[in-house]
From Swiss-Prot:
BP-aspect Gene Ontology terms: translation
Protein name from the UniProt record: Large ribosomal subunit protein uL29
Homology family: Belongs to the universal ribosomal protein uL29 family.
Classification via SUPFAM superfamilies: Ribosomal protein L29 (L29p) (SSF46561)
A Pfam family hit: Ribosomal_L29
The entry's keywords: Ribonucleoprotein, Ribosomal protein
Gene3D superfamilies per record: 1.10.287.310
GO cellular component: cytosolic large ribosomal subunit
Native source organism of the sequence: Trichodesmium erythraeum (strain IMS101)
Length: 82
């Protein structure tokens, strides 16, 4: 099973990203429970889910920084015109 591509994550809306983050965190929690009880069969899912979570959090942070940069640019432009 190949890792998910980051291009797929970039196509998601902010709300979808937030939902996916919650979903992946829940899956990681469930995997840890299975590991603790000794019933886990697909140990590679830890790596895949951590990778997916990192992608989602990276895109979320990029968008947050872009919004902040845009807002600060707008504020500085307004201050310069006065």
């Amino acid at each position: 099973m190949p890792f998910p591509k980051i291009a797929e994550v970039r196509e998601l809306s902010d709300e979808e990203i937030a939902n996916e983050i919650a979903k992946v965190k829940r899956e990681l929690f469930d995997l840890r429970i299975l590991k603790a009880t000794g019933r886990i069969e697909k140990t590679h899912l830890f790596k895949h889910n951590r990778h997916r979570l990192a992608q989602l959090l990276t895109i979320e942070k990029e968008r947050e920084l872009a919004k902040n940069a845009e807002a600060s640019t707008t504020v500085s432009t307004v201050e310069n015109t006065q």
